[in-house]
Amino acid sequence: GIISLILQIGNIISIWVSHSIQTGSQNHTGICNQRIITYENSTWVNQTYVNISNTNVVAGKDTTSMTLAGNSSLCPIRGWAIYSKDNSIRIGSKGDVFVIREP
């Protein structure tokens, strides 16, 4: 009981410290204001990586941050999905798309 609680608190603290070390004090708000969208796919084929990169220029698109229904802003998304142990894409009930990568 109490040991499990202490281990979980230690796990959350270590994830927070790791995230703080990786990001530092960087602010990534400029990512949402891009007019160029790059789709990149790295696939393992015959012991080598094949990189496929498609670049699209979004013309005439409004770059302001958009708020969806339910008062959830589309960008930026911050935080950790602590209980997700796999690489996955989750689609929320309001249409939000979350890409979760295993650390």
UniProtKB/Swiss-Prot annotation:
Key word Glycoprotein present: yes
GO CC term, one of those recorded: virion membrane
Binding site for substrate: R101
InterPro entries: Sialidase_sf
Note: The influenza A genome consist of 8 RNA segments. Genetic variation of hemagglutinin and/or neuraminidase genes results in the emergence of new influenza strains. The mechanism of variation can be the result of point mutations or the result of genetic reassortment between segments of two different strains.
The record's note on its domains: Intact N-terminus is essential for virion morphogenesis. Possesses two apical sorting signals, one in the ectodomain, which is likely to be a glycan, and the other in the transmembrane domain. The transmembrane domain also plays a role in lipid raft association.
Free-text function comment from the UniProt entry: Catalyzes the removal of terminal sialic acid residues from viral and cellular glycoconjugates. Cleaves off the terminal sialic acids on the glycosylated HA during virus budding to facilitate virus release. Additionally helps virus spread through the circulation by further removing sialic acids from the cell surface. These cleavages prevent self-aggregation and ensure the efficient spread of the progeny virus from cell to cell. Otherwise, infection would be limited to one round of replication.
Name of the protein: Neuraminidase
